[in-house]
Amino acid sequence: FFLISVFIRERYSSPGMTPDETAQLMLVKSEDDGKTWSEPINITSQVKDPSWYFLLQGPGRGITMQDGTLVFPIQFIDATRVPNAGIMYSKDRGKTWHLHNLARTNTTEAQVAEVEPGVLMLNMRDNRGGSRAVATTKDLGKTWTEHPSSRSALQESVCMASLIKVNAKDNITGKDLLLFSNPNTTKGRNHITIKASLDGGLTWPTEHQVLLDEAEGWGYSCLSMIDKETVGIFYESSVAHMTFQAIKLQDIIHQ
């Protein structure tokens, strides 16, 4: 599945549900590894509150939970014009979608990972600046708990970031990993860095980090495992609008 938000109006999105009023949330799907794609499927009415100004995807990537539930991170501007991050999910392979409660107010671009069976972590861009907001849910977003690392462990300059969970059986370290990438700074969008956590996101030691680009760029990124030894990162760098690099885990995690 690929999730996009389409703005029909020329200038802005407003409360409402129709294309003339508000941005439309669309899905396209592929059943042949991306060779062909379906026509867009409009799911706005399934997940958007009419009072919201708009509802957007993460951006970044969604996940499939161990029980098969599909999950996308989302963000929306509520009736008071405050941004909020959360998740939407499907338990029937994308036929129907559901959205419950926001994870933390005044947050926007987020990424989701299943850190334990049934436990989702949402890592969020926080408009307060300085560091990432992090929350967890055990009930698909009905209730949220602030994570101990929230607003302290991962610095940011108010920018998008990427987060993935890599299970022990799927990587050469034999340990459960969280991998994270963003501009590792509180000012500007520079020092694009990949970090690893071996304790479920509580800590991100400097010995488990690799700097990719220290110069100024746009700073958005997306991580994905290539094989058990290698993670790929697609990011906005200082040398090109979009750059792809393949990084060995042994260059990130020094044991």
Regions found by a protein language model. Give the residues of each.
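Asp-box/BNR beta-propeller blade signature and adjacent active/binding-site loops
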Residues: 1-255
